[in-house]
Design a protein with these regions (language model features):
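NAD(P)-dependent Rossmann-like dehydrogenase/reductase catalytic/cofactor-binding core
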Residues: 2-6, 11-17, 233-347
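NAD(P)-binding Rossmann-fold cofactor-contacting core
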Residues: 44, 50-75
Length: 347
């Protein structure tokens, strides 16, 4: 492990330098890695493992769009693509990459194949952390761990193809064989992680649920809408309001922040922007911190998990979800966004 100073706090991380791909391949050489679920994370992780020389099979319900995608990606029925239970039977490491709702539904069929010495892998701590609500309690004679890439499966794959990678967290929940940590780290490297930092199942799920409801999606979309609405109410055109709210951020500022940091951005903008941003940053922090604390408490109490499980268990959930998404898609805000994106220069 390498010890890195993160803003004055020392953390141990695992990089490709001290845990090479060759080492990962050696650890996994006798394993059959069964990737269960070919939806959000499944394709990226499975294809990266395959390209890195790991023995991988995919388990997916036949006849679904995800099954068809797996076939299109080169997985062969009966050779590397199987129904879920058959893949679980063959796998020595079962990577449970189904959705949280899907994991609950598939658990009874999956757990009978979790025999002594096998490993159960997650990319999210939801099912195990909220086991009282999900019913997911792994047998005590298997390894249980997670590797959680900090981004989508599509990003994991595209960065891998460029020779890059996403950072990932990892956690060992149960070490029955004495090999759980090396199995977890080997898989973390083999799926294309840039570096791995240690967490726990609980911390992973608490930070993840807070992040996606907060800055990553919920808060971001909410503040987008708020600023757009204010500009429109004050007489600005849809195009101007969208450009000043979203387009400049995503196309100009965030790539620079990603490359250089927000501190660099503050030091390299106009003096007018610089002064205003410094003055208003604290006000936004003070306004949003109580909301984020309320959000974290809701996650910690299990309320957010309960909402998700209850919503996903309703027979008309997908229909209701499409109605909610349609409101977003048909709003002036995002209809304007669609037109703005079409006008981006392509050359």
């Amino acid at each position: 492990m390498a010890t890195i100073n993160f803003g004055g706090v020392l953390e141990n991380v695992v990089t490709r330098e001290e845990f090479s791909l060759n080492k990962a391949q050696e650890i996994l050489k006798n394993e059959t890695v069964a990737v269960i679920g070919y939806g959000v994370q499944g394709p990226g992780q499975a294809l990266n493992l395959k390209d890195n020389g790991i023995n991988v099979i995919v388990g997916q319900r036949k006849g679904t769009a995800s099954w068809n995608k797996a076939v299109a990606d080169g997985w062969e029925e009966g050779k590397s693509l199987f129904e879920v239970e058959e893949a679980c039977k063959q796998g020595t490491i079962i990577m449970n990459l189904l959705s949280d709702a899907g994991q609950i539904q598939a658990w009874e069929g999956m757990k009978k194949y979790l025999t002594k010495g096998k490993a159960l892998y997650f990319s999210h701590g939801f099912g195990v952390t909220f086991h009282e609500k999900t019913g997911i309690v792994p047998p005590n004679d298997i390894d249980v761990f997670l590797v959680a890439p900090k981004g989508s499966g599509a990003s994991l794959r595209s960065l891998f193809l460029k020779g890059q990678g996403l950072n990932s967290s990892y956690a060992v929940f149960q070490d029955a064989t004495g090999k759980a940590q090396e199995r977890a780290l080997a898989l973390g490297i083999a799926i294309g992680s840039g570096y791995l930092f240690e967490t726990t199942f609980q911390k992973e799920v608490y930070s993840d649920l807070t992040g996606e409801r907060g800055v990553l999606m919920g808060a971001l979309a909410g503040i987008f809408e708020a600023q757009y609405n204010v500009l429109r109410q004050r007489g600005h055109s849809p195009s101007e309001a969208f450009n000043e709210t979203v387009e400049e951020l995503t196309q100009s500022l965030m790539p620079l922040v990603a490359e250089n940091g927000m501190d660099w951005m503050y030091a390299n903008c106009s003096t007018t922007a610089q002064r205003g941003a410094l003055d208003w940053k604290g006000k936004f922090r003070e306004a949003t911190e109580p909301v984020l604390n309320e959000l974290y408490d809701s996650v910690l109490s299990g309320k957010e998990a309960e909402i998700v499980i209850e919503a996903n268990s309703k027979p008309d959930y997908r229909e209701k979800l499409q109605e909610e998404l349609a409101v977003l898609q048909q709003s002036e805000f995002w209809q304007t966004g669609a037109q703005v994106r079409k006008l981006r220069p392509t050359k």
